[in-house]
């Protein structure tokens, strides 16, 4: 072993494993690029992003920590969201929550026929965020 060397497993790292996923379509209606980070409460994202906000309440992007999704002006793409875990309290961002998540507002797809369900049983291998915003 070399000092400072990091030896990692040769398997893929699974993130947000066993968290229900919701896929929504988002369009940047503004005239400037918008970037949303991995832990940003998507419900509170820039007002120039047009999407069904209530479906994003209590959720963040299903991407690795430190990553982001960028929306160029006029871009329309699908993104995959997962619920916050832990104590389920949100502070800061645009100040729209600043406290515990109101569980009655969290969209949880349960109907297989729901066009927004986007719930996959394969632990993220169908994650639309990994495919440039397009579901295959």
Curated annotation (Swiss-Prot):
One of its GO terms (molecular function) is urease activity. Pathway: Nitrogen metabolism; urea degradation; CO(2) and NH(3) from urea (urease route): step 1/1. The keyword Transferase does not apply. Keywords: Cytoplasm, Hydrolase. One of its GO terms (cellular component) is urease complex. GO terms for biological process: urea catabolic process. It comes from the Bacteria. Its EC number is 3.5.1.5. SUPFAM superfamilies: Urease, beta-subunit. It is found in: Cytoplasm. Pfam families: Urease_beta (PF00699). Residues 112-136 are annotated as: Disordered. Its main location: cytoplasm. It catalyses: urea + 2 H2O + H(+) = hydrogencarbonate + 2 NH4(+). Belongs to the urease beta subunit family. NCBIfam families: PRK13203.1, urease_beta. PANTHER family: UREASE. Heterotrimer of UreA (gamma), UreB (beta) and UreC (alpha) subunits. Three heterotrimers associate to form the active enzyme. This is Urease subunit beta. It comes from Staphylococcus aureus (strain MRSA252).
